[in-house]
Amino acid sequence: MNSIEGIWQPAYAEFNGEEAPKMMLDKMELELANGKYFVRFGGVVGDEGHYKITPTGITLLGSKGPNAGREIPSLFKFVDDMLSICYGLDGILPSRYSTAAGQQRYLANYYRKLPAS
């Protein structure tokens, strides 16, 4: 099932070349449904907005939370049953699925927790 919609649990993530703690990832989930996104931490929505699929990837348009008013261009791909997203937190579309110090990139590999309802 290669639909981006559903509830996704991060299995691995890194920001600016540093791996995110597993304990943080275990409490986080990303929901993509009907053009809207929600990021939950411990079941509480901490960030939300809209998304649109583009010819080059996916763009998040934040409406509430730390990304309110921001446009975040991102790459995405499916690798087997995993969804990989590389977010351009600086507003620039990443050119590859990697991060390094000072780049303002967030890379996450997700597994599907639940399909879209």
Segments the model singles out, each with a brief description of its role:
Residues 11-25, 33-98:
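Contiguous, well-ordered beta-strand patches that form the walls/edges
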Residues 1-9:
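N-terminal helix-cap/turn-to-beta initiation motif at the start of protein domains
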Residues 109-117:
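Short beta-strand-to-coil "C-cap" segments at the C-terminal boundary of structured domains/repeats
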Residues 100-103:
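Short, solvent-exposed loop/turn segments at conserved positions within beta-propeller repeat blades
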